[in-house]
Design a protein with these regions (language model features):
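Intrinsically disordered, low-complexity non-transmembrane regions of multi-pass membrane transporters
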Residues: 1-25, 224-239, 273, 277-280, ...
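N-terminal signal-anchor module of multipass membrane proteins
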Residues: 1-91, 98-106
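Generic transmembrane alpha-helix signature in multi-pass membrane proteins
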Residues: 41-47, 99-108, 134, 158, ...
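Flexible hinge motifs at transmembrane-helix junctions and intramembrane kinks/re-entrant loops
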Residues: 52-59, 187-235, 240-262, 266
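Membrane-helix interface "capping/anchor" motifs
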Residues: 74-89, 134-139, 193-203, 320-325
Length: 339
């Protein structure tokens, strides 16, 4: 009886699972997205020529922004019949790679402040798209959204292959050690996901990453020096980089926000169809996209880079069927503490 109650809570959107079950599932979401979350900040800081201290602030803002954006999506603070801010769906928000090429160009020609100014304009574009999503949605039937979801999955393969090889720019990119660790990690995840039961199946990704990490330790591939040199606690610095508006940058980022707003339909649809066996409602789509826009406007003042729904975490929800908001909120809190 106790097992049935726990399962229904874990797989229920509004349940409150036990900490010992929620924490590993939350951590699984974090380890699946944290590299993708901080990498854009690292790339932008390098192109912009930021000092080490400013680079840390930008990375810190990326984590805090992702955490707060996720919490806004999970727990909408405005939700009426005709208007909502936040979807209330089990999604994870993070700094998006889709903006990286444009951000690199802007950072090289201008500065980080110009990216943040363009982000405000882009957020306003997303809010506009979200407000009219009820009318726009008819142009995206299940056939179209299904194709988008399929495309999202395919688009992750180049990123996955690069990470498996060691990460673009790595000195040992493509080495046999990298491929061995990656393939062993993949094997652990695949075996547990198909043959494991209970928490072993649900936390297959986390267990696979831990296993891969241990294997990497034996190969001497883990460097602890950055952890030793890092400060234990640091408060975020709002408006540290300032805000600047440049028309060309605003247009480029604004267009990307419009495109990502449409892609969000696919991510929200993949989340509900994969984890909840239904399509998202108009209210959920509107709240999700409006929340996406407003969070980017607000958190630009914290120095956070543009966010978007994370497809890899959508995949976790669809695979494990764990849609509990408290689990994903736990992931957001881990990101917040890390930031």
């Amino acid at each position: 009886m106790k097992h049935q109650t726990t399962r229904s809570t874990i797989f229920d959107l509004h349940g409150v699972p036990a900490f010992n079950q929620a924490f590993p599932l939350a951590l699984q979401h974090v380890v699946a997205m944290i590299v993708g979350c901080v990498t854009p900040a690292i790339i932008v800081s390098g192109v912009a020529g930021l000092s080490e201290a400013d680079s840390v602030i930008l990375i810190q803002a990326a984590l805090v922004t992702s955490a707060l954006s996720t919490l806004l999506q999970l727990f909408p603070f405005i939700k009426t019949r005709y208007f909502a801010i936040g979807s209330g769906l089990p999604v994870i928000m993070g700094i998006s790679f889709a903006y990286v090429p444009s951000m690199q160009s802007i950072a090289a020609e201008y500065d980080v402040a110009t990216i943040l100014g363009a982000m405000i304009v882009g957020g306003a574009v997303a809010v506009f798209v979200g407000l009219f999503i009820r009318s726009i949605r008819k142009f995206f039937p299940p056939l179209i959204t299904g194709t988008v979801v399929f495309t999202i999955g395919l688009s992750l393969y180049p990123t996955a292959i690069n990470y498996m090889a060691g990460g673009t720019g790595s000195k040992d990119y493509g080495s046999w050690q990298n491929w061995l660790v990656a393939l062993l990690t993949l094997t652990i995840v695949t075996v547990l996901n198909h043959f494991g039961k209970g928490i072993w199946k649900l936390a297959s990704i986390l267990i696979g990453i831990i296993g891969g990490y241990i294997i990497a330790l034996f190969f001497g591939m883990v460097d602890f020096s950055p952890i030793q040199d890092a400060s234990f606690f640091q408060i975020p610095s709002p408006m540290h980089f300032g805000i600047r508006f440049e028309p060309s940058a605003c247009i480029a980022i604004g267009l990307l926000f419009a495109i990502n707003s449409i892609q969000a339909i696919g991510d929200f649809s993949a989340t509900t169809s994969g984890g909840m066996n239904r399509m998202p409602t108009d209210q959920e789509l509107q709240g999700g996209i409006v929340g996406y826009g407003i969070s980017n406007i607000l958190f630009s003042f914290l120095g956070g880079l543009p966010t978007a729904t994370y497809s890899q975490n959508v995949g976790i929800v669809a695979t494990t069927k764990v849609i509990n908001r408290c689990v994903l909120a736990g992931a957001a809190l881990i990101l917040l503490v890390a930031g």
